[in-house]
Amino acid sequence: MGVFTFVCKNGGGAWSAKQHEGELESSASSTYELQRKLVQVSLSADSSGGVQSSFSLVSPTSAVFQVIVGGGGGGGFSAGGAASSGGGAGEAAAAPKEDEKKKEESEEEEGDFGFDLFG
C-alpha cells in the first residue's frame, strides 16, 4: 500500500504539484487534469491495487491531493459482518424501541429552544 501526498499550487494559470517528502511531481492547466496526472504518476511508483484519492483546496491558489494505492479498503459498503450467530434476534427487536426513545427525546429538546428544525 502506498500513500502519496502532494502539495498543489496555482501560478500563472497552471497548477503544479510536488510530492510531500518525495520526488514525484506533475503540472497541468486545471485541477481535474492535475489529479488525473498525479494518480498516473502514483500508479507508476506503486501499482499494488485499487486507488482512492482526495483533493482539498486550502486557498484559491493552493491545495492538497492525496492518492492511496492498494490497501483493499475501498468504498463505504462492506459485506463483512453480514452473517451473524443465532440468538441475536431479541437484541435486534429491542434496538428499534431504543431508537424511538432517542427520537422522542431529540424532538423534546427541539421544543425547548422554541423552534422546529424540520417544520
UniProtKB/Swiss-Prot annotation:
Residues 79-119 are annotated as: Disordered. InterPro entries: Ribosomal_P1/P2, RPP3. GO terms for cellular component: cytosol; cytosolic ribosome; ribonucleoprotein complex. GO terms for biological process: translational elongation. Transmembrane segments: none annotated. Keywords: Phosphoprotein, Ribonucleoprotein, Ribosomal protein. Residues 79-90 have a biased composition (Gly residues). Phosphorylated. It comes from the Eukaryota. PANTHER family: 60S ACIDIC RIBOSOMAL PROTEIN P3-1-RELATED, LARGE RIBOSOMAL SUBUNIT PROTEIN P3Y-RELATED. HAMAP family: Ribosomal_L12_arch. Plays an important role in the elongation step of protein synthesis. Belongs to the eukaryotic ribosomal protein P1/P2 family. This is Large ribosomal subunit protein P3z. It comes from Arabidopsis thaliana.
